[in-house]
Amino acid sequence: MSESQLSLTPVKRSFQFGQHQVTLETGGVARQADGAVLVDMADTVVLVTVVGRKDPAAARDFLPLTVNYQERTYAAGRIPGGFFKREGRPSEKETLTCRLIDRPIRPLFPEGFRQEVQVIATVLSLNDEVDADIPAMIGTSAALALSGIPFEGPIGACRVGHLDGEFVLNPTFSQTAESDLDLVVAGTQDAVLMVESEANLLPESTMLDAVLYGHEQMQVAIDTINDLAAEAGKPRWDWQPPAKNESLDSAVAELVRSDLEAAYQIADKQERSERVGALRDKAVEALADEEREGWGAGDVGEAFKTLEKKIVRGRILAGHPRIDGRDNQTVRPLNVQAGVLPRTHGSAIFTRGETQAIVVSTLGTGRDAQVIDALEGERREPFMLHYNFPPYCVGETGFIGTPKRREIGHGKLAKRGVEAVMPSDEEFPYVIRVVSEVTESNGSSSMATVCGTSLSLMDAGVPLKAQVAGIAMGLIKEGDEFAVLTDILGDEDHLGDMDFKVAGSKDGVTALQMDIKIDGITREIMEQALDQARSGRLHILEQMNQVIDKPREQMSEYAPRLLTMRIDPERIRDVIGKGGATIRGLTEETGTNIDISDEGVVTIASADKAAAEEAKKRIELLTADVEVGKVYDGKVAKLMDFGAFVNILPGRDGLVHISQISNNRVENVADELSEGDSVRVKVLEVDRQGRIRLSMKAVEEE
């Protein structure tokens, strides 16, 4: 080997993961990153890199972890569209995958770790049957395990499907399309940390079995990562958690504890927040003294936060009422309204305590469908759900712009919650857009969106299979003691150990999302959470059904009316015409919108039913076959020496030979007919070339 050649000796490990072989490779690519892994799962290849900054952390009270997941079009052998011909801002799929990676790894960084960490997952090659999200999650876990950054992993991750009553590990895209379940689960060797799923009204027991099945199956990935890290991992950073400042904790408790306990018994969120904020300011002002005690404002703030957590959690575990006075199983007071906006196609306001959403549904035609240029291929999405979380909903000011990751994630969760009960395109050929405007928020606005969406769609006349509702559960756990909380507040979410969101109908679960911050969540705890969630969901559904319990039979007068018909695909060109002239004239003259699929399904949209019927009639004429023996009312289009051409259907002319004009002898065609004359003709013959022979004489004889 010459001296100019560089020797790369990557370390590889492989394992069987369902129907796919997975290979992890490190040491050959991106060697300047703290950790870098190439993951190959049946030709879907993802490069995951991790870099952590070792310089002293700035004064901050959070972990500055950034996760970027990026899909390159070359991975699927394609060139990007658009003027610049390069990838643009992250797609919804990329944003959701970033969240999917972030959620299970964030709780595994040690408490007090404040160094900046960046994860970048890049899809380099795509098998269009294998989603890149699971390889990206496994690669992130492996790269962190190799990096030496303090991390209490590794984690494993897998997708679980449900086909023919059996669980399927890491189903392909084709299998997922047929599956009753699409569930992604991630966790450590001992505990489940995250679940993201949608289901076709499955029972709670099946959902729980799927979570535990996935956790069991992912152990092979965790073992392989441990094996890879043992051979190729870097030394663990020499990082020590900041020492507990017990004297500061005691000083804060002595100063504000009794007042803080009283503040956390104020039911009104804004009043409580103002009181807690004032107590925090009091503690900082009284105790922050860098020169004398060495306590900065940030240190006092951390100690105050620790005391808050102790007070709220301690009261709940001791059996005292929650912050707003409820017991652990009570849903907040509800207010349900449907049909609240006069000109929209469907609308609802759903209020649960201090969480409220105005949800509006709009019906459109096929041309309104969202075109998604996904890596695995282009597709059209006929159902959209958008979630907006403006700053005023929590009493704050802030920047209004493009949707943030959280808004995209919450919108997707709400969409998962209702997708199982949506009608098929054949049952309801409209494109549907739902927008949720969160107008108040104190916990679980995504589940309020699920409830509001169901109400709004029913108000719009969309034939849902069932009414659906969603609820968020929480958990407080200390040692063997635990309390499962129904319909959590924002503070309970922030100070608790689990966020467990469940959506569904009275018959089963449609969506389940779970984020767990601690180890030790047992089957018993998850069963209790699902059981309480079902009780809460049924209570909410009962209240919703009192307002509207089935889709309205009459749609809004402002919604478009759709007529559908099927034509021979070979006749599509007759409807469209040369350069689109025919269909353009048809839409302008009737005031309708017309969409034609490649299969010959014609959808006519108009707010005026009569106009839609007129367009349908014209299309039937354009595509009708000429019947031999049938009499048509036609118009003379052109005179010739040997006869006249008569238009009997749009675009269809036939010849009346001079001998077929009259029973009397005709010497000159112009003596009997003029262009534009209306005549009745009978079809005598259509030859192999499609030429039509007509007769006026045969009509006279009849």
Swiss-Prot record:
Gene Ontology MF, one: 3'-5'-RNA exonuclease activity
Swiss-Prot/TrEMBL keywords: Cytoplasm, Magnesium, Metal-binding, Nucleotidyltransferase, RNA-binding, Transferase
Residues covered by the KH domain: 560-619
Disulfide bonds: none
Catalytic activity: RNA(n+1) + phosphate = RNA(n) + a ribonucleoside 5'-diphosphate
Example of a GO biological process term: RNA processing
EC nos: 2.7.7.8
Gene3D superfamilies noted in UniProt: GHMP Kinase, N-terminal domain, K Homology domain, type 1, Nucleic acid-binding proteins
Family: Belongs to the polyribonucleotide nucleotidyltransferase family.
NCBIfam families for the chain: polynuc_phos, PRK11824.1
Name of this protein: Polyribonucleotide nucleotidyltransferase
Annotated source species: Halorhodospira halophila (strain DSM 244 / SL1)
